[in-house]
Amino acid sequence: MKLIAYLIDGHQVDIRPAPVERDWMEATSQRFAYRCLPLNIANAYGWEVLCNASFLAMWTGGSGIDAILIEPEPGTIAPAVSHFGHGILTFHIPCLFRTEPGAELMVQGPINRPKDGIAALSGIIETDWSPYSFTMNWTFTRPDTPVRFEKGEPYCHIFPVSCGALE
């Protein structure tokens, strides 16, 4: 299955093949977690989109777009915004992705990389016809809990799927 990413002019994006390694798996006794083949396969399935700058975000519990406080590292611009309100943190992905006819793009949080205080939302992008870019969204799971995203940390995991095959 073919996947093409067209970068929107004036933007940068850092995409890499998803690696097998996970910090929490490395920390298990004798790296025991790597003995689970389904975890290893899932970890490395697809590509990851990485943060281009470190930042701290916190949801105050309100429903407005002003209820998320975002603090980028000095001299940088945070790659996420409060766009929808209701505790949803939004990353704009500056690419137009294209897949072959009948293939869509599964978009979700990084596989087997839990993050305290926030959860990734998932979606299917109809990249075989849609002429639009998309956003990756996370929802805070509790208010007043600072969440940090580091430069180079994955915030989105993508892989092509054939949804028609499920019917």
Region spans (language model):
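Non-catalytic terminal segments and appended small domains
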Residues: 1-133, 139-167
